[in-house]
UniProtKB/Swiss-Prot annotation:
Pfam families recorded: ASL_C2 (PF14698), Lyase_1 (PF00206)
Domain of life according to the entry: Bacteria
Sequence similarity: Belongs to the lyase 1 family. Argininosuccinate lyase subfamily.
Keywords: Amino-acid biosynthesis, Arginine biosynthesis, Cytoplasm, Lyase
Enzyme class: lyase
EC number from the UniProt entry: 4.3.2.1
Known catalytic reactions: 2-(N(omega)-L-arginino)succinate = fumarate + L-arginine
Official protein name in the record: Argininosuccinate lyase
One Gene Ontology term, aspect cellular component: cytosol
Pathway(s) where this gene product acts: Amino-acid biosynthesis; L-arginine biosynthesis; L-arginine from L-ornithine and carbamoyl phosphate: step 3/3
GO molecular function, one term: argininosuccinate lyase activity
An annotated GO BP: L-arginine biosynthetic process
Subcellular location: Cytoplasm
C-alpha cells in the first residue's frame, strides 16, 4: 500500500507506478534510511509520542531489518515498494504491527530523503577522500623513484624545456591536493541535519534538533525548514568536485597515453592495466587510461543534469528532485573506480629513461638557456630572444642541435658568445638552473617530495 493512498479513490496505473517509483535507484539509501529512522524513534520517544518500550522495540526491529538485508539490493528491489522509505516502513510494520505505523509521526519523506542523501554523501565523500589520498601517495612514490629521470616538457604539445619526470608527477600531486581540499570543503557544508524539518514548515513536535543532529553525527541541524527540504547543493557540490577531479584525471591519462605511445616511448605500462587487439597481435593498448578519459564525459553530464534539474524549481520539494540520485550515484561510482584505476596504473608504471632523455635533447629545448646566457652577457632579453630565434633557424638548416654548432657559427649571430657557452647548453645545466621553489631542478623536486611525504 502506498504511503499516500487515503486521498485517492482510483487505482494507480501500472505505467505511472513504473514511471514514479524510485526504489530501483534509491535502494542504495537503505542503510541511511534505517539509521535515520532509529534516530527519529529516539526523537519522538523523547517528546512522548511513543513510550520508551515502544522505542526499544522499533529500534530492535530496524536493526534486525538492517542485518537481514545486508548488502543484497535484490532483497529490496524485488518487493516492488515505491521507494526506500516505503520499503523500510512496510517491513517494519510486518515485524511490529501497528507500532510500525507510529514511526513516521512528525516526519515527512521530504526531510527523510534529504537526511538520507546527506548521510550517504558524507559516507561516500569520506571514502573518496581516502581514494584521493591513495592516488596522491602513488604519485609521490613515483616522483621519488623517478626524481631525476629527464624528459621533455611541452607547451602546445611542442617540446619546450627539459623537466624531470618527478616534476611532472608533482604537478598532478598539486591538482589532486586541490581536489582533496575542494571535497573536504563540500563535505563541511553538507554536514547539517535536515531531519525535523517536516514537509517544509518544520515538525509539529518539540523535537530537540540539536540532539537529533548529534545522534546522526552531523555538525549541527539545518536552520531553515524550507531550505532544508529544498536543498540539493550537497549533490551539486559533490558532482562538481568529481567533475574537476575527473578533469585532472583525464589530463593525467592523456599525458600518459602520449608518453606510452610508440612516438614517445617515455613510459611502459604494466600488463595488468592494458589489453590487446583481437586482430593485431602486437598491440598493447592503454585501455585503463582511455576509459578514465572517456568516463570524464559522463561525470560532466551528471553535473549538468542536476544543475539543470534544480535551476528553476520553486520552493520547496518537487518531484523533479527525485532525479538527483541516479546521476549522483553514477558520478560517485565513476570517480571512485577512476581513482582506484589511476593509482593502479601509477604503481606499475616504468619510465624508459633513455628514450625520454633523447627526446629532451631534441627540439632545441635548450634555446632558452642560450637566451639567458646572452642576457648574462649584457644583452636585453627581448634582443636575446630574437637572436636565439635566428640561431634556431640556422641550426635547423644545418640539421644540428645548437650545442653542436661551432663557436664561429654562433658568434656570427652574437659577438658576446664565447667558449663558455657550451656548458650552459647541456641538459644538466638546463635543469640545474631551474633551482627555484617549484622549479624542476632535481634538488628542488627532491625537497618538494620530502615536504609532501610529511604532509
Amino acid at each position: 500500500m502506498a504511503l499516500w493512498g487515503g486521498r485517492f479513490q482510483g487505482e494507480t496505473s501500472a505505467l505511472f507506478k513504473l514511471f514514479n517509483d524510485s526504489l530501483p535507484v534509491d535502494y542504495r539509501l537503505f542503510e541511511q534510511d534505517v539509521i535515520g529512522s532509529i534516530a527519529w524513534a529516539d526523537a519522538i520517544a523523547s517528546v512522548g509520542v511513543i513510550s520508551a518500550a515502544e522505542c526499544t522495540e522499533l529500534k530492535a526491529a530496524l536493526k534486525e531489518l538492517l542485518a537481514e538485508v545486508g548488502d543484497d539490493p535484490q532483497v529490496i528491489i524485488s518487493t516492488g515498494a515505491e521507494d526506500i522509505h516505503s520499503f523500510v516502513e512496510q517491513k517494519l510494520i510486518a515485524k511490529v504491527g501497528d507500532l510500525g505505523k507510529k514511526l513516521h509521526t512528525g516526519r515527512s519523506r521530504n526531510d527523510q530523503v534529504a537526511t538520507d542523501l546527506k548521510l550517504w554523501c558524507k559516507r561516500e565523500g569520506a571514502a573518496l577522500l581516502a581514494r584521493l589520498n591513495t592516488l596522491r601517495s602513488e604519485l609521490i612514490a613515483l616522483a621519488e623513484r623517478e626524481v631525476d629521470a629527464v624528459m621533455p616538457g611541452y607547451t602546445h604539445l611542442q617540446r619546450a624545456q627539459p623537466i624531470t619526470f618527478g616534476h611532472w608527477c608533482l604537478a598532478y600531486v598539486e591538482m589532486f591536493e586541490r581536489d582533496l581540499s575542494r571535497l573536504t570543503d563540500a563535505l563541511k557544508r553538507a554536514d547539517t541535519c535536515p531531519l525535523g524539518s517536516g514537509a517544509l514548515a518544520g515538525t509539529a513536535y518539540p523535537i530537540d534538533r540539536h540532539a537529533l543532529a548529534s545522534a546522526l553525527n552531523f555538525a549541527r541541524p539545518t536552520l531553515n525548514s524550507l531550505d532544508s527540504v529544498s536543498d540539493r547543493d550537497h549533490v551539486v557540490e559533490l558532482c562538481s568536485s568529481a567533475s574537476i577531479s575527473m578533469m585532472h584525471l583525464s589530463r593525467m591519462a592523456e599525458d600518459l597515453i602520449f608518453f606510452n605511445s610508440g612516438e614517445a616511448n617515455f613510459i611502459s605500462l604494466a600488463d595488468d592495466v592494458t589489453s590487446g587487439s583481437s586482430l593485431m597481435p602486437q598491440k598493447k593498448n592503454p585501455d585503463a587510461l582511455e576509459l578514465i578519459r572517456g568516463k570524464t564525459g559522463r561525470v560532466y553530464g551528471s553535473l549538468m543534469g542536476i544543475l539543470t534539474t534544480m535551476k528553476a524549481l520553486p520552493l520547496a520539494y518537487n518531484k523533479d528532485m527525485q532525479e538527483d540520485k541516479e546521476g549522483l550515484f553514477d558520478v560517485v561510482d565513476s570517480w571512485a573506480i577512476c581513482l582506484d584505476m589511476a593509482a593502479l596504473v601509477l604503481s606499475g608504471l616504468k619510465v624508459n629513461r633513455e628514450p625520454a632523455l633523447q627526446a629532451a635533447q631534441q627540439g632545441y629545448a635548450n634555446a632558452t638557456e642560450l637566451a639567458d646566457y646572452l642576457v648574462a652577457k649584457g644583452m636585453p632579453f627581448r634582443e636575446a630572444h630574437h637572436v636565439v630565434g635566428e640561431v634556431v633557424v640556422f641550426a635547423i638548416t644545418q640539421q644540428q642541435p645548437i650545442e653542436d654548432l661551432t663557436l664561429t657559427q654562433l658568434q656570427a649571430f652574437a659577438k658576446e658568445i664565447s667558449d663558455d657557452v657550451y656548458p650552459n647548453l647541456t641538459i644538466a645545466a638546463c635543469l640545474s638552473k631551474r633551482n627555484v621553489l617549484g622549479g624542476t631542478a632535481v634538488n628542488q623536486v627532491s625537497a618538494a617530495i620530502a615536504v609532501k611525504k610529511q604532509d
